[in-house]
Amino acid sequence: MPSKFSSKYVDTEAISNDDDNPFATAKSYYSKDTDLSTRVSAGRPRTLSTSMEASAAPTIPELKNLRRRGSLDEHKQPRKFLVDVDKTLNALLESEDTDRNMQITIEDTGPKVVSLGSASSGGYRLYELRGTYQLSNLLQELTLAKDYGRRYILLDERRLNENPVNRLSRLIKGTFWDALTRRIDASVLDVICRDTKDRSGSHVNRIYVPKAEQEMYEYYVRAAKERPYLNLQVEYLPEEITPEWVRDVNDKPGLLALAMEKYQDDEGNTHLRGVPFVVPGGRFNELYGWDSYFESLGLLVDDRVDLAKGMVENFIFEITYYGKILNANRTYYLLRSQPPFLTDMALRVYERIKNEEGSLDFLHRAFSATIKEYHTVWTATPRLDPKTGLSRYRPGGLGIPPETEASHFEHLLRPYMEKYHMTLEEFTHAYNYQQIHEPALDEYFVHDRAVRESGHDTTYRLEKVCADLATVDLNSLLYKYETDISHVILEYFDDKFVLPNGTIETSAIWDRRARARRAAMEKYLWSEADSMWYDYNTKLETKSTYESATAFWALWAGVATPRQAAKFVDVSLPKFEVAGGIVAGTKRSLGKVGLDNPSRQWDYPNGWSPQQILAWYGLIRYGYEEETRRLVYRWLYTITKSFVDFNGIVVEKYDLTRPVDPHRVEAEYGNQGVNIKGVAREGFGWVNASYEVGLTFCNSHMRRALGACTTPDVFFAGIKEESLPAFENLSIHKN
């Protein structure tokens, strides 16, 4: 490490901030108000120090024979360090980041010790920081301080050795949610219009607005004129959106408008602004379907009701004008939805705002939109299977999905390219415009689009069969729609729910629909012999044998009888439970992985937040508290372990069988959140949510064990003789 240096003369007593919050957000902690370079005192010299070896300290003759390990002295008050940001950051990376990836992890082979000068000694007395966790936290703090333009900082020791459970939860609540928040209006159009999936080669930004939203259209036209550098085109959507129109507009793709609200500025003028929403990860700018539901669960835990409500409002807007909750709000997604969760989402938000003015109107609008989507999307052709009465993921569309990489389907298409003596571009155009007819290829893309609508892209469970499957996940969700709608009509609208077109809905009809779906699911999806819920192939009229964690959704929705739940927990739960939580599918169902059978991200051994959360709520709904806590601890341990050992990362999914590095997932899409530089800035939406939701299931014993990174097996062995208190204050909708 470099030796100590003299820099500014800083009066450390004058800037002492013992009363300041050491766990404030980075934006607050590294604000200009705490900038040491603005607090210079000419009267008394002090020194700032970078991290350094103790032997490099200046020699004082009178003390040269005294050797004290000041860094190991006991102390009652938390220390504060005076730090030169750039020099300490560079020295830290040089010494500790041995693989040069801008992270400090357990895989780096540096000494794992640095020394910092204390503020109370003016940077003279050095104290050691040891271990991966403290050093990676130091790297994160220095990176953030540099982001905020800080040259020198007064860094509280408590910020470096903070309990990792508290630190991660604090970051999610105070930093990650804000970093993932977007809105669509003039203030952010230059960022929000960017589309990493746009293959058209055009440099034109486009936004498409519903025909009925004239004020919104004029707003964006005005914004385009005021900001010519945006190169923004504002287009009206046609009244009727057809597969042909969606195909044709792939040559000029664009963003789809979302809800806006009116507000008054300080001068009393009225303006429009976008209703905010949360995106799945840092590289996204769109409102996604089922990601938003799980994010809302975490947002509500963290009292970010405004964002959860905003996403419901945006979904109402989408159903009103685009006919469905979209995969995401881009033109190429106009025919594709995602797993529907709107009733539960709206009810949870309503519970938090029910005493506010307009809350009942909010609930009415949300459920009116849900009923429209239910009838026109999920129980209509082509998604409804008339014989079973069950529904399938089966979106419309023509040609090859345009949002994929240009080469994504090249291996599949090459035989056809050779057959017709065409290049990839030539064949793609001819096929998309039905100049070439290949029934086998048509069927492939019907299933491919269905897999994408399911949200489970990709998995061997759904590959080449998805559009024919009445899946347990979709039908559990629709059962939940039916029971929620029945409950809301009866409890909140006196059993008379008037739709915008004047139609009156009663609870009885929705109750009958729910009972009919439950009977059909028991007949076609439930296996008494296997104690398992399976998908049903409506074309072959046979049950699938793939064991998927979506079976837990039947418990979450309340489809299962108590007897079925008991059999499922006794026989099937052990097939999914591994060291890190619930795997997406069982090892038996995956089969042998090889060159011709590569790993898929929604298969064993990977685990995803949606499957964990729905399993927790499903199990606790039927009274399985011990099993719920066990699964919660496993999943939170997986996230916490990666966070502690790998520089604070929070990733999209985890390999639940890897005890050391579960964030490393070997699958076709990689893993978002792995390649951070210095600090994780937003985590991943539904993983953030799963952590916050999971902590609501934890008692103090579990939190302490997680903070100490106690492995699940050790923790469970320690509590085998001990009874844990019952769950309290869990929000579980059992309608």
Curated annotation (Swiss-Prot):
What happens when you mutate residue 100 to L?
Answer: Decreases calcium binding. Decreases activation and increases cellular trehalose level during osmotic stress and thermal stress. Does not affect binding to tps1
Region (Disordered) residue ranges read 1-55
Record's GO cellular component terms: alpha,alpha-trehalose-phosphate synthase complex (UDP-forming); cytosol
User: Catalytic site residues?
Assistant: 457 (proton donor/acceptor), 652 (proton donor/acceptor)
Annotated positions binding Ca(2+): 97, 99, 101, 103, 108
Q: Which cofactor(s) are needed, names only?
A: Ca(2+)
Q: Where does substrate bind?
A: 283, 290-291, 327, 336-338, 455
Gene3D superfamilies documented for this protein: 1.50.10.10
- Name a GO molecular-function annotation: calcium ion binding
Reaction(s) this enzyme catalyzes, per UniProt: alpha,alpha-trehalose + H2O = alpha-D-glucose + beta-D-glucose
Phenotype on disruption: Increases cellular trehalase level during osmotic stress and thermal stress. Resistant to heat shock and osmotic stress. Delays spore germination.
Keyword annotations from UniProtKB, A to Z: Calcium, Cytoplasm, Glycosidase, Hydrolase, Metal-binding, Phosphoprotein
Q: Does the keyword Manganese apply?
A: no
Q: What are the Phosphothreonine sites (modified residues) in this protein?
A: 47, 50
Q: Which GO terms describe its biological process?
A: ascospore formation; trehalose catabolic process; trehalose metabolic process
Q: What is the effect of changing residue 51 to A?
A: Abolishes activation during osmotic stress and thermal stress. Increases cellular trehalose level during osmotic stress but not thermal stress. Does not affect binding to tps1
Subunit-structure text: Homodimer. Homotrimer. Oligomerization occurs only in the presence of calcium. Forms a complex composed of at least tpp1, tps1 and ntp1. Interacts with tpp1. Interacts with tps1; interaction is independent of stress conditions and oligomerization state.
What is the protein named?
A: Cytosolic neutral trehalase
Q: Can you name the source organism?
A: Schizosaccharomyces pombe (strain 972 / ATCC 24843)
> Gene symbol?
ntp1
